[in-house]
C-alpha cells in the first residue's frame, strides 16, 4: 500500500510540478530506484499471492507480541496516568528492516529482541504480516480506478521511513531487501536543507498533514514510523449514556453496548469485538481485584496475554459497554530511543553500533527511531486511527433496537487497556491504555 501511495504522489508531481514543490526529488528517494521482487514464493507477500505464512511464523508472532507488550510498558512509564496509543508492530517491522543493515553485536542485539530469529525469518514473516494487514480490506476495491485511494475507506497502513545524510551511500543489497520485504521509503538528503521539514511533511501527508520531525543538522540516520487504520464494527451497537471514571473526575460519555465474546483470567477480564473489513480483533481488558491498569500492564506478558485470548469460548458472551473515546497523539514525531533502550537495545543508538551491511564504510550512526504517534477515535460509527484525527466521530444512534441476550454485564467505565490485534497471529497492531 505504501508503494501505491508513493507512486501516486510521484506521478502527480511529474504531471504537475507545482502540485507539491516540497516533495522529495527522484534523486533523494533512493527506494524508488529499486524494483520490488514480486515472487511471493520468496517474499511471502500476501498481495502478490502468498496464501500461507512462513514456517517460522508462530515463533515470529510470539516474539513480536512479547516485544509489543514490553514497548507498551515503557511507553506507559513515560506518561503515567495519561492515555497512550502506539503501533508496536510497526516499530518491530522497522527494527526488522534495520537488522538487514546491522552487523556484529548490533545485529545480534536486534535479533535477540525477537527470540533470536534470523534476519531472513524477520524479513519473510514481516512481509507476510504487513502485506496481509494492508491487503485484506483492499481486495474488494478496484485499484485501477482513477479515484482509487488506499487510505480512503476501510484500511490498515503501516509506513516505515529511513532518512539518511547525503554524506553516506546506502548499499544496493540493503535497498533491495527493503523493497522486497517492507516497501519502506529510504530518503537521502542534506540535514541542513531548510526545506527538509516541509519535504518530510509532504511524505507523511497521507498520515498527518501537520507532521513534524526534529532532526539535527549533524544527524546521520533516523528511522520513522507512521500508521493509519479505518474500519467499522462487525456487530451492531446500541447507545447508553453513562459516566467514565478516569484518572481525573468522572465524565459523562456515551457507551457502545453489544454482546461480545468474554475473556477472563485470574488477573483481568475483557471482551473481543471484530472489525468489519480488516483482519483485526479489538480487545478491551480491565484488571480485577482493584489493581490499577498501570500495575496490570507492568506485569502483562505473553502468558497472561495468551491466557486471555485462549479463555474465549464459543457462545460465551457478555453484555459489553465500551465508552466512545478519543486519544490525540498530536503531530510531533515521538522519539522511541529511551523506550527501546529500556527494552534491551542498549547499543543500537550509540557510536559503538555497526551498520556495515547498510553502509560499507561502517561509519553511519542510527540517531533515533521515531513514531508519529497515532490518534484514535472509537465510537459506534467505527474506528479511526491515524497520526492525527480531525475530531470525535459522534455516535450515530442508528441501532437502538439491537437485541442483547447476554445476562452478564461488563462495563468499561474505568481505565482499561485495549489492543487491535491481527486475527491470525494475535500480533498487536495497535496497543494502548485509555484513562
Summary of predicted features, one role per range:
Residues 110-114, 237-244, 295-302:
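Short Gly/aromatic-enriched secondary-structure transition segments
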Residues 18, 26-48, 362-364, 375, ...:
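Non-catalytic interaction/Regulatory regions outside core domains
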Amino acid at each position: 500500500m505504501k508503494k501505491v501511495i508513493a507512486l501516486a504522489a510521484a506521478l502527480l508531481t511529474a504531471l504537475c510540478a507545482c502540485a507539491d514543490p516540497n516533495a522529495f526529488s527522484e534523486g533523494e528517494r533512493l527506494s524508488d530506484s529499486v524494483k520490488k521482487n514480486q515472487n511471493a514464493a520468496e517474499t511471502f507477500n500476501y498481495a502478490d499471492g502468498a496464501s500461507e505464512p512462513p514456517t517460522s511464523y508462530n515463533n515470529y508472532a510470539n516474539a513480536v507480541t512479547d516485544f509489543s507488550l514490553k514497548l507498551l510498558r515503557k511507553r506507559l512509564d513515560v506518561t503515567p496516568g495519561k492515555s497512550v496509543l502506539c503501533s508496536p508492530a510497526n516499530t518491530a517491522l522497522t527494527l526488522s528492516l534495520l537488522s538487514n543493515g546491522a552487523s556484529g553485536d548490533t545485529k545480534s542485539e536486534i535479533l535477540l529482541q525477537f527470540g533470536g530469529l534470523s534476519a531472513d525469518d524477520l524479513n519473510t514473516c514481516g512481509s507476510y504480516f504487513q502485506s496481509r494487514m494492508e491487503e485484506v480490506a483492499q481486495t474488494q476495491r478496484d485499484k485501477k480506478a482513477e479515484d482509487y485511494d488506499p487510505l480512503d475507506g476501510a484500511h490498515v497502513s503501516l509506513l516505515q521511513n529511513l532518512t539518511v545524510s547525503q554524506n553516506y551511500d546506502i548499499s544496493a543489497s540493503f535497498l533491495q531487501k527493503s523493497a522486497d520485504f517492507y516497501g519502506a521509503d529510504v530518503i537521502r538528503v542534506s540535514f541542513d536543507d531548510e526545506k527538509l521539514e516541509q519535504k518530510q511533511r509532504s511524505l507523511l501527508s497521507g498520515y498527518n498533514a501537520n507532521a513534524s520531525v526534529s532532526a539535527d543538522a549533524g544527524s546521520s540516520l533516523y528511522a520513522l514510523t507512521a500508521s493509519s487504520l479505518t474500519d467499522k464494527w462487525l456487530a451492531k451497537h446500541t447507545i447508553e449514556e453513562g459516566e467514565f471514571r478516569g484518572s481525573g473526575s468522572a465524565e459523562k460519555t456515551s457507551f457502545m453496548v453489544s454482546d461480545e465474546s468474554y475473556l477472563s483470567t485470574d488477573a483481568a477480564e475483557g471482551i473481543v469485538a471484530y472489525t468489519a473489513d480488516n483482519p483485526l480483533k479489538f480487545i478491551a481488558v480491565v484488571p480485577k481485584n482493584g489493581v490499577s491498569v498501570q500495575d496490570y500492564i507492568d506485569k502483562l506478558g505473553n502468558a497472561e496475554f495468551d491466557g486471555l485470548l485462549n479463555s474465549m469460548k464459543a457462545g460465551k458472551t457478555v453484555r459489553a459497554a465500551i465508552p466512545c473515546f478519543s486519544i490525540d497523539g498530536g503531530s510531533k514525531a515521538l522519539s522511541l530511543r529511551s523506550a527501546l533502550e529500556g527494552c534491551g537495545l542498549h547499543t543500537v543508538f550509540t557510536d559503538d553500533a555497526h551498520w556495515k551491511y547498510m553502509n560499507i564504510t561502517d561509519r553511519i550512526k542510527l540517531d533515533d527511531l521515531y513514531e508519529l504517534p497515532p490518534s484514535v477515535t472509537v465510537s459506534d460509527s467505527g474506528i479511526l486511527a491515524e497520526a492525527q484525527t480531525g475530531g470525535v466521530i459522534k455516535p450515530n444512534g442508528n441501532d437502538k433496537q439491537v437485541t442483547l441476550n447476554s445476562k452478564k454485564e461488563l462495563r468499561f467505565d474505568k481505565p482499561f487497556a485495549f489492543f487491535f490485534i491481527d486475527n491470525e497471529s494475535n500480533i498487536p497492531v495497535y496497543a494502548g491504555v485509555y484513562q
